[in-house]
Every structure is written in C-alpha cells, then in structure tokens.
Amino acid sequence: MAPAVGIDLGTTYSCVGVFRDDRIDIIANDQGNRTTPSFVAFTDTERLIGDAAKNQVAMNPHNTVFDAKRLIGRRFGDAEVQADMKHWPFKVVDKSGKPIIEVEFKGETKQFTPEEISSMVLTKMRETAEAFLGGTVNNAVITVPAYFNDSQRQATKDAGLIAGLNVLRIINEPTAAAIAYGLDKKVEGERNVLIFDLGGGTFDVSLLTIEEGIFEVKATAGDTHLGGEDFDNRLVNHFVTEFKRKHKKDLSTNARALRRLRTACERAKRTLSSAAQTSIEIDSLFEGIDFYTSITRARFEELCQDLFRGTMEPVERVLRDAKIDKSSVHEIVLVGGSTRIPKIQRLVSDYFNKEANKSINPDEAVAYGAAVQAAILSGDTSSKSTNEILLLDVAPLSVGIETAGGVMTPLVKRNTTIPTKKSETFSTYSDNQPGVLIQVYEGERARTKDNNLLGKFELTGIPPAPRGVPQIEVTFDLDANGIMNVSAVEKGTGKTNKITITNDKGRLSKEDIERMLADAEKYKAEDEAEAARIQAKNGLESYAYSLKNTISEGQLQISEDDKKKVSDKIDEVISWLDNNQTAEKDEYESQQKELEGVANPIISAAYAAAGGAPGGAAPGAGAAPGGGAGFRNDGVVEENEELD
C-alpha cells in the first residue's frame, strides 16, 4: 500500500505531496502540472476534472463547477453565498437551507452537494498520487483555512470520505506552511514566525513560535472569503463597465463572454505581478465585437485598494491576540499565489519594516507541510524530520453555550491550544425546572443571536428543586481536527447526554455519505468506460487511415481487384465512423475486426510475395484495444495473426 499523502484542497487550485525516504515530493498531474485546477465539468458524454475541466470552461460555462470551497459547510442564505452566486455561471439552488449545485450531465439535470464536487477534486489528487506511487492511496491529511468554522471542517472531512479516503487529520493551511518553512530553514532557537497566507479564495494569518521541532500556534485570524478571485472580480467589473461605455452593450448577460473575460483578467493579474502594464485582446467577445484594451499595475492596485488594505487588519488582530509586538516577529512567510502581487508584498514589508521571506514556494508549501504531517500521523518514524515535530494548533473561534437572557458564555476561548477539554458547572433558571436545553454556539459576540449555532440537545429528568440548586456540568471536548464533542451531566442523578457537533442542520448524514460514495464509484466507472470507448474509436480511425496510406503508396504488389476491395471497405468504415461518433466500444471493435478480416489476408499475401516487407510498410495502429489482430509499425506480424 502506498504511503499517506498531504492534500492542499484549494479554492482555485489543489496540490498533493508525499513524504518518504526523508524527502518530500510534490506530485505532478497527468498534464505535468504540480497544481491542479479545482474544477469539475459535466458534458453530454463525460465528466472532466482538473486541467481538462478548466480548459473547456468557455465552451461549457453553465456546467463547469469551481469554487466549491466557497460553498462547503455554508448555508444557502449566507451573505457570501448570495454575493458569489452573482459571479458564478453555474446554478446554485436551495435544498432545505443547503446550497446545491445543479448541472446538465449526459442530457439530465443532476444535483451535487459542495462536498461531492470537492470529493471529485480530491479523487483526482488521489489518482495523481497513485499514478506516481504505483499503489492505492488510502490515508490523507487534508488542509483547510485556519479560520474555517466547525461545519466547514466537518464538510471537508466528509468530502474526503466520499472520495474514499481515510482522513487522518484536518490541519490548518498556515500551520502546514509553517512546517514547510521550519523544515526548509532548520530553525535555531525560538523564533516567532508570522504566516501570511493569501490564496485564490481564502486568507489566513497565523503567528507561531517554532523551537526545536515544536510548532506552537499562538493566534490565528483571517477571512474565509478573500483571495485572488475577488481581485479578478474587480477587474471583470471594471472591464464590463468599460465595454458598456465604449460599445453601449452589456456583456454581463452572456456567460461565455464573461468567462472569456474572466480568464483574460486572471492572466492580466498574473502578468501585472512582473510588468507595469499589460494588454487584453479578446476577439469577438460579445455580439461580434473585438475587445482590445490595456491596464496598468497602478490601476489594478487602485481597483483592489480596499481589499489589499483589508489584509492588514487580521495581521494586527493576531499580534494583539498573541500579545506580541510586531518588532518581535522574526520572520514573515508569504504563502498562497496571491502573495506574488507586489502591492501585497509592499504592504507587509512596510508594516513590519522588513522584507518578507520568499524562500518557500507559495503554491506548494501547504501540501508540503500536509505531507509531513501525514507521514507523522501514519507512524512513519524513519526520518529525523518526522520524529522531532510536534504541532500545537489552536481553535480559531470561541465556543460556548447560551445562558439566561441569550448571553454567550464561552467555555473554550479562541486561540486555545487544541486538542482541549474544558468543563464548567451551570444550574437551572427557574424552580422545579425538569430539563435544560443546551445550545452550543461559536463566535466572538456577547449575544448568542450574533454567533453561529452549532447544535443543541436537551438534558431531561432533573428532579424538582429550587432554581440554582441542580448542578449541571457541561464539558467541551475539542479534538485535533477542530471538531467538537459536548456532554452534560446532572451531578445529583448522574443523568447524562451528549452531542458531537456535526452541525445537524448542514451536515451530511451517514446515509448521504454512503450514497455519494456509491455515486462516486459509478461516475469513476463511467469515466473509465468513456476513456476505453474513445480509445477504441481512435484505434479504429488510425488503423483505417494508415491502411489507406499503405494501399495508396503502392509499395505492395496488390491486384487492382484486391486494392478496390480493401479501399471500398476502408471508405465504408470511415463513412460509418463519421456518422457514429458516439457508438459503443464493442461497435468500434467489431468494425475493426471486419476491416481486418478483409485487409489482413490480402496484405499478408502481398508481404509473403514480397519476401518480407521493408520497415514501416505495414499499416500502423495495429491491434484494436480489445487485442484484435493487426500489424505493428515495424512490419512484423502480431503474434495472434495466423498466416496462410
């Protein structure tokens, strides 16, 4: 079995790494890229994931899904979800409060949860690792933004389950990046390191103290809804307005035009990290109008000014929470593709009065750290690196219960090191109260109505007593994934009740996950069948054409009658191919067998007459994928071909 892997499941791109033999490999996909777009596309015939999905997005905008990370673990009514829906060409619908993605797939309307879409991306990452490692990958560490809440973490874990992975741990992205930095740098003495992680869709800042392999997170802050895509949106809006001004037409009504514009904006943004200005040229963007324009780095910075400036607020909050002065930060590490933007780098270096550290690859650092953690958690003690690391992470948000009058009483304060267990004793609010409702909230506000309800349960059967007499002990147990168990016990009777906060409102049930796992297997089998079908079609096509070339080149002594017989059959097959692009695999194979049945005896006889053929005279593409007879390119008869 292959070793455990680390997967950085990103909003826009994902990355997978493995730690073995004392080194990290960041694994390239089948296109040779070390990061894979977090895109899934559905067409009339197949499902595409990664580069193949992103490459066809302009032709198929309504059925190409991305940004699942901006939906996962959220409610349909969330302000962010509603705002994002304006930018997405795919359809998101409300299903009992959860956002569900709706697409056309093989001529039918299909619905997928964000967890399922994310699981497809995870499956692609898993397959990328399996191709490299040559074995089945079962265990993985998956990363999430440090500021992800309980339901977002749980939903990410579910996505891993649907992808058939045993999720060893959900770890925070900046913490994973800190491991990459710590291993890369071989840090001496105690260092305060600030990780500034700005990716495609999320932003995290974490402050860690690193000393002799102990990585202790002191504080974390961020915005689970800020990243490169928001900068792209600003550019898109800017150019939509410009197009309207120049041509009096609104292209925002056309999904394909918008997608082409967005792709150009993303490219322009990247160019502006190294050039002071760039041009955008899109032929026939909308209603036949060519759109040629340019943008300077200064204008781009102005368009995103508030977003860029806003990244400093979490930095200040982290320093406040950790009670560390900015002059005591030894090293600032930039992670995430968006930290390549010069303005961001300048804001950070101006704030700290020192240059940020750019020694680690911003796209790969998170997967790198996750791979190390995967090796540690799967018990790999072969290396000094894995033996000496201890990770102490924190809870990103305070968690507590509602007490009389809707007051939030936190039991676990934000930035508490996890795993942790905290207990507190409460009592009843009125005389002879038979039970209490325990409501668990997450957030920093003083009143529960302003925080996020994680779940609730009742403790009943409390014997009649005056208010304030019964002793109810509530215990919060926060595990290393940042996922919560809450229990309550009434001391007098020993009555207990507990809940694992799996966000009952939004969480997938066990049955849902099992159904989605079965669906995932089904889609995978369909993908493989489609690949085999296309291989059979291509095999038949190349066999027919190479046979045609062999006949027409006239190198073989074949009678005119035989030549006509073979040529007619080839033309018949090519014409059949043109009209049957969606035929089944066995239909292509039987066509190939028929063609071989006509051609092989004639060509074999011609070879025999010629006393063996010169190299390369035989038709290429030989056997069908099913292993039918044929010739190899070197003129040698395949072993299963009988010669008369």
UniProtKB/Swiss-Prot annotation:
Recorded coiled-coil stretches: 510-600
Disulfide bonds: none
Highest taxon listed in the record's lineage: Eukaryota
Cellular-component GO terms for this entry: cytoplasm; cytosol; extracellular region; nucleus; plasma membrane
Induction: Up-regulated when grown with elevated levels of potassium chloride.
Gene3D superfamilies per record: 1.20.1270.10, 3.30.30.30, 3.30.420.40, Actin, Chain A, domain 4 (3.90.640.10), Substrate Binding Domain Of DNAk, Chain A, domain 1 (2.60.34.10)
Single GO BP term: chaperone cofactor-dependent protein refolding
SUPFAM superfamilies, per the entry: Actin-like ATPase domain (SSF53067), Heat shock protein 70kD (HSP70), C-terminal subdomain (SSF100934), Heat shock protein 70kD (HSP70), peptide-binding domain (SSF100920)
GO molecular function: ATP binding; ATP hydrolysis activity; ATP-dependent protein folding chaperone; heat shock protein binding; protein folding chaperone
Protein name: Heat shock 70 kDa protein
Organism ancestry: Eukaryota, Fungi, Dikarya, Ascomycota, Pezizomycotina
Gene that this sequence comes from: hsp70
